[in-house]
């Protein structure tokens, strides 16, 4: 998280980010044959509406950074809820605040909304129902304050996002429609490397790509898409059961963090090719494997 703060300071005072420092634009040009784009010479994901900069720390882009924050957020919630020492609770709360600050720096609306749902789900699993109501009240008041008393630019951004008039939101909608049409016409798929943002996909002929479920559906058909969705639901369910029924605090932590991480990644999966985010994808599936092992052998 310190990298994110360092990145923010770097940008404000020296007008550079880690992406500039490590010459990411040159890497994309030479290795991926992608020309620099946007007002910052990187790609369009590094800026929001009105050329507002978005930060990625040392990750490939802000979307991957924000998705990875879900994992850290889930871990911080675990320590905050289950720590018995006051010092540890304060440290966990500080970590939560740093992560929330990082969400704003990455400015991924899907991940920020997902973080709220992750918090509610974590409090529900741990049976902190009063805190859920308090949190929802605070979030609602905060949203209403931002919507009615913030700058016009931010208010218009919220309106355009909800009504799909924002360029990014409209792009998602178009990609979803393309994917759904392809699945309807080809229910058994059109083949691999035909959808998504992976380097092996020819962007000139790709179909859809802003929804992980539709990407699998376009490429491998409806059956594969449904199986992938059921695997996610089953992993969340089994991890939750592991947390609720285990008597070992270490096993409970694995179940809790796994359930929250996979639950929190559902929204990013609906808006991006999120399985390409290697760090959070590999680590979260590793946690699923550990959770399933404990669920089948220890309960």
Give residue spans per PLM region.
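Alpha-helical transmembrane segments of multi-pass inner-membrane proteins
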Residues: 1-29, 33-107, 112-125
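Transmembrane alpha-helices of multi-pass, membrane-embedded glycan-processing enzymes
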Residues: 4-7, 66-69, 218, 224-237
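Aromatic-anchored segments of alpha-helical transmembrane domains
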Residues: 7-9, 99-102, 140-147, 262-271
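A membrane-periplasm/extracellular boundary helix in multi-pass inner-membrane enzymes
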Residues: 9-21, 106, 123-163, 180-184
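Long extracytoplasmic/lumenal interhelical loops at the membrane interface
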Residues: 53, 149-220, 239-245
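Transmembrane alpha-helices of multi-pass inner-membrane enzymes
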Residues: 74, 116-120, 258-299
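Hydrophobic transmembrane alpha-helices and their immediate junctions
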Residues: 80-81, 86-92, 98-100, 116-124, ...
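Short, aromatic-rich membrane-interface segments at the entry and exit
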Residues: 88-91, 110-112, 130-135, 228, ...
């Amino acid at each position: 998280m310190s990298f994110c703060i360092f990145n923010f300071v770097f940008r404000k005072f020296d007008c550079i980010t880690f992406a500039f420092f490590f010459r990411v634009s040159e890497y994309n040009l030479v290795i991926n044959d992608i020309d620099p784009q946007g007002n910052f010479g990187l790609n369009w994901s590094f800026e929001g509406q009105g050329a507002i900069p978005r930060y990625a720390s040392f990750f490939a882009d802000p979307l991957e950074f924000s998705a990875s924050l879900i994992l850290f957020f889930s871990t911080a919630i675990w320590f905050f809820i289950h720590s018995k020492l006051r010092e540890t609770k304060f440290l966990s709360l500080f970590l939560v605040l740093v992560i929330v600050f990082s969400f704003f720096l990455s400015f991924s609306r899907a991940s920020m909304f997902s973080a709220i749902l992750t918090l509610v789900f974590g409090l529900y699993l741990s049976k902190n129902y009063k805190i859920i109501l308090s949190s929802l009240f605070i979030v609602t008041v905060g949203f209403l304050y931002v919507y009615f008393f913030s700058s016009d630019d931010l208010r218009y951004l919220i309106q355009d996002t909800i009504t799909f008039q924002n360029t990014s939101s409209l792009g998602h909608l178009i990609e979803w429609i393309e994917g759904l049409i392809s699945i309807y016409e080809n229910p058994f798929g059109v083949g691999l490397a035909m959808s998504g943002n992976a380097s092996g996909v020819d962007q000139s002929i790709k179909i859809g790509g802003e929804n992980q479920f539709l990407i699998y559906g376009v490429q491998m058909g409806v059956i594969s898409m449904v199986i992938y969705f059921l695997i996610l639901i089953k992993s969340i369910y089994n991890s939750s059961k592991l947390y609720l029924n285990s008597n070992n605090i270490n096993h409970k932590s694995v179940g809790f963090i796994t359930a929250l991480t996979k639950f929190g990644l559902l929204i990013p999966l609906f808006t991006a090719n999120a399985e390409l985010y290697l760090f959070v994808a590999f680590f979260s599936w590793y946690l699923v494997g550990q959770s399933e092992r404990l669920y089948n052998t220890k309960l």
